[in-house]
Design a protein with these regions (language model features):
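ABC ATPase nucleotide-binding domains
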Residues: 149-170, 174-189, 433-453
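Proline-centered turn/helix-capping motifs that create local helix->coil transitions or kinks
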Residues: 193-205
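Extended non-transmembrane interhelical loops and adjacent amphipathic helices
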Residues: 9-10, 32-34, 185-195
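ABC ATP-binding cassette signature C-motif
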Residues: 1-149, 211, 217-453
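Amphipathic, soluble alpha-helical interaction motifs
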Residues: 18, 67, 152, 166-173, ...
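Internal alpha/beta loop-helix hairpins
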Residues: 189, 207-208
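A short, surface-exposed helix-loop junction/capping segment
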Residues: 7-18, 164-174, 206
């Protein structure tokens, strides 16, 4: 204090007491713990920092720390995993499992739901139902429930038909025999009460997203990289990717992975129908595509200036359909027909993502380069994409942080935090983890290597 007189000391003591009564000291302890956990520094070191200068992941984790450590016993979390990297999601899963609070969360991250949710509440067809189990059993539980609902509705319809026919029969008999009038009135009353109670809940309609990714036969070696270096991003590495393989590109956040996909797109000699050439990517060494490899790129940011101002129907008709009905039928398979006349930029993120996948299908790409394809897809669309890739006759290289999606891949090309590129038998999500190169395989020409000096 600049002044040490008695009135000043009294005011200072009063202010401290007021701060304590308001819970200020407890708040300081809480926020110190939050800042250390989320930002790696104590509250005193960052107390004046503008929140807008934090990354999206830092902001989200700081808020989640405050909520999970705070006094509230019930938390409502809307997409709490957005902006979190995989390490952040794993931290969130652990905290959700450990907390004694009641948590209601909305999420499309299937791995998060599987690891953290004890019950799954589904809202569909204006009804709500609860699955008391892990997400990995959710799909079967939903099928079983829908089968029960369909059977109940079938029985109700049969009984409804029987009661209506009984009323008709008794009406005819009552017209000829007064003694049947009481039975007729009883049947009418019974039918009325049955209809007043109403039918059981209808089984909800399944999402009808049908991705017919076909591809085509190419040379055995689909991608060849020799001493390839992404200038200023990653150290030189070698790798070969063979026809039909599913390779996930994983690793630390930051530049490198998306550049790798754009580089593969830029060196193509043959592009699918409707695809636009990619801008050159600075690199040294060799990056080459095999015979008859025609790559299609799914852009993570959905940045497609060539589609701006055009409707999905117009886009499909330009390159892939001569008739409007053909275009709308294709859009309907991706549940896009209802927005077929909206400009591309007004579509939701999920709609733009599904349209991009449809264009890859119609273009006939034999190599799919997918940059975070499930980021904006709901659960049904993400599962439809995985089903489409299972039957796809071509090669797939995908950058992803979706752990559930990554389970379906054969190989993992890891872009490490130390600028190395190497193969791993399992996905590596920790940005600080350094892995060892995978030993070269020598079996029947189907070998695949990735090296980083």
């Amino acid at each position: 204090m600049e002044r040490d007189d008695q009135p000043t000391q009294i005011r200072y003591a009063t202010a401290l007491a007021t701060w304590a009564d308001a819970g200020g000291y407890d708040a300081e302890i809480l926020w110190d713990a939050c800042c250390v956990s989320a930002l790696g520094v104590p509250y005193e070191s960052c107390r004046w920092r503008q929140v807008v200068t934090l990354s999206g992941g830092e902001q989200k984790r700081l808020v989640l720390e405050a909520l999970l450590r705070g006094p509230d016993e019930v938390l409502l979390l809307d997409e709490p995993d957005n902006y979190l990297d995989v390490a952040g999601k794993q931290w969130l899963e652990q905290r959700l499992r450990e907390t004694s609070k009641t948590v209601l969360l909305v999420s499309h991250d299937r791995e998060l739901l599987n690891q953290a949710a004890e019950r799954i509440v589904t809202v569909e067809s204006r009804h709500v139902w609860i699955h008391s189990g892990r997400f990995e059993r959710y799909a079967q539980a939903r099928r079983d429930r829908n089968e029960r609902l369909a059977e109940l509705r079938r029985r109700w319809d049969e009984e409804h038909t029987r009661l209506k026919q009984l009323v008709v029969d008794l009406r005819q008999k009552a017209a000829a025999n007064d003694g049947m009038a009481s039975r007729y009135r009883a049947a009418v009353t019974r039918l009325g009460k049955f209809e007043e109670a109403g039918p059981p809940e209808m089984a909800p309609r399944d999402r009808n997203i049908n991705m017919r990714l076909r591809g085509g036969r190419t040379g055995r070696r689909a991608i060849i990289c020799e001493d390839l270096e992404l200038t200023g991003l990653m150290r030189p590495f070698d790798t070969e990717i063979w026809y039909g393989e599913r390779v996930a590109v994983v690793g630390s956040n930051g530049p490198g992975k998306s550049h790798f996909l754009r580089l593969l797109m830029s060196v193509a000699d043959d592009l699918p129908r409707g695809a636009i050439p990619a801008e050159p990517v600075a690199h040294s060494g060799l990056a080459r595509l095999g015979a008859r490899v025609s790559p299609g790129l799914f852009a993570q940011t959905h940045a497609r200036p060539d589609l701006a101002g055009r409707t999905p129907c117009e886009i499909v008709m330009t390159e892939h359909a001569r008739l409007r009905t053909e275009a709308m039928n294709a859009l309907a398979r991706y549940e896009l027909a209802f927005c077929g006349e909206q400009p591309f930029e007004t579509l939701s993120g999920g709609q733009q993502a599904r349209l991009q996948i449809l264009l890859l299908e119609l273009g006939g790409a034999t190599l799919l380069l997918l940059d975070e394809p499930t980021d904006n897809l709901d659960v049904a669309s993400a599962e439809a994409l995985q089903q489409g890739l299972e039957t796809y006759q071509g090669t797939v290289v995908a950058v992803t942080h979706d752990r559930w999606f990554a389970r379906s891949f054969d190989r993992f090309l890891v872009f490490g935090a130390d600028a190395s590129v190497y193969e791993s038998p399992d996905p590596v999500w920790d940005a600080t983890q350094v892995g060892r190169p995978r030993p070269q395989r020598c079996d029947s020409g189907d070998s695949s290597t990735a090296r980083s000096p």
